[in-house]
UniProtKB/Swiss-Prot annotation:
Complexes and interactors: Homodimer.
GO biological process, one term: homoserine metabolic process
Acyltransferase listed as a keyword: yes
Enzyme class name: transferase
Gene name for this UniProt entry: metXS
Organism: Laribacter hongkongensis (strain HLHK9)
Family named by the database record: Belongs to the AB hydrolase superfamily. MetX family.
Origin superkingdom: Bacteria
This protein's name: Homoserine O-succinyltransferase
Binding site for substrate: 225, 354
């Protein structure tokens, strides 16, 4: 297989093992853990051209490239990462990591608990965005990266980029926060709870210890994903793609799949339930719920951002109702009030929340322009 000139080509996942205990926000301590990660491009001698990509709820470390020549699925942000792409691997050293609690190689509920010899399951502790950032900082130390040229993330990944700028202000030159929010709204917490209930009430869940029973709570995962997927799309986007199209010529007057949108959602749910871990889904949604950096400052986001040193790009999409532009503007206003440097882009799109994964021309142009400036400043 011949790869396009702007592809990172064949890649391989790596694993970093840590035996220094990690104290979590919940009060639990992980004595040892592993992080699965990938890198693209080359770290320069000054070690100042590194970019960290933080993934969203269902993401992972495989950001770009393919694992073998006949691999049909490129990394989840392959359209944005590669030579000559906005996140240009000819100029930057790019790192993608699967977060703690994940199900793609990093230590999580499906990993073996060394204390028992069995999967962690329900015993795996809740993890938070600050916990992830602490573990990512240890990975950065291992890779010889003292300061990121940029930390970039969309949705839950954007929360991590924001947390990086606050927790390690001296280690982040730029933070790109895309389609995100400074905390979840009550409606978003409600969506997450309904999704969790779908999993928790699945008879095959077994209190989180389904591994020992040789089953998977597919029904719950399927419903959780179907609900989530609706919130990632826009009404206009769904209408344009599916409308009221029927799979057959007319109504069947039953409860089987009739509309194309029903078929699409069930396909997405079926696919996801075969790839993702139910306990990880619960952990990721709780990490979303708990993220609220202003909480420690009596709800004052300006005060929470007072120590940041990074320059910011905040980006939002007009049709995103899960993380609406108003939520991004909250971050912008707080940064301005705190006297920080921030650029804001609001992109016209019909793709809803998922637009941050797409290649709408204004979005690509915004990312390219901002990161070109970052690269030029490094070269100066």
């Amino acid at each position: 297989m011949t790869f396009a000139s702007d592809s990172v080509g064949l890649v391989e996942a790596r694993r970093a093992d840590f035996d220094t205990p990690l104290a979590l926000a919940s009060g639990t301590v992980l004595d040892r853990y592993s992080l699965c990660y990938e890198t693209y491009g080359e770290l320069n001698p000054e070690a100042n051209n590194a970019i960290l990509i933080c993934h969203a709820l269902s993401g992972h470390h495989h950001v770009a490239g393919r694992y073998c020549e006949d691999d049909k699925q490129a990394g989840w942000w392959d359209n944005m990462v590669g030579p000559g792409k906005p996140i240009d691997t000819a100029r930057f050293f790019v790192v993608g990591v699967n977060n703690l609690g994940g199900c793609h190689g990093s230590t999580g509920p499906s990993s073996v608990n060394p204390a028992t010899g069995r999967p962690w399951g329900s015993a795996f502790p809740l993890v938070t965005v600050p916990d992830w950032v602490e573990s990512q900082a240890r990975l950065a130390d291992l890779l010889g990266i003292r300061r990121w040229a940029a930390v970039i993330g969309g949705s839950l990944g954007g929360m991590q980029a924001l947390e990086w700028s606050m927790r390690f202000p001296e280690r982040v030159a730029n933070a790109l926060v895309i389609a995100s929010a400074p905390k979840l709204s009550a409606q978003n917490i409600a969506f997450n709870d309904v999704a969790r209930q779908a999993i928790l009430t699945d008879p095959e869940f077994h209190g989180g210890d389904f591994y020992a029973h040789g089953v998977v709570p597919r029904r719950g995962l399927r419903l959780a994903r179907m609900l989530g997927h609706i919130t990632y799309l826009s009404d206009d986007g769904m209408g344009a793609k599916f409308g009221r199209l029927l799979r057959s010529g007319d109504y069947q007057y039953g409860f089987d799949v009739e509309f194309e949108i029903e078929s699409y959602l069930r396909y997405q749910g079926d696919k996801f339930s075969g790839l993702f871990d139910a306990n990880t889904y619960l952990l990721m949604t709780k990490a979303l719920d708990y993220f609220d950096p202003a909480k420690a400052f009596d709800g004052d986001l300006v005060a929470a951002l007072a120590r940041v040193r990074a320059n910011f790009l905040i980006a939002a999409f007009t049709s995103d109702w899960r993380f609406a532009p108003d939520r991004s503007r909250e971050i912008v206003k707080a940064l301005v009030a705190a006297g920080k440097r921030v650029s804001y882009g609001e992109i016209e799109s019909t793709h809803g929340h998922d637009a941050f994964l797409m290649t709408d021309s204004p979005y690509v142009a915004l990312m390219r322009a901002y990161l070109n400036r970052v690269a030029e400043e490094l070269a100066a």
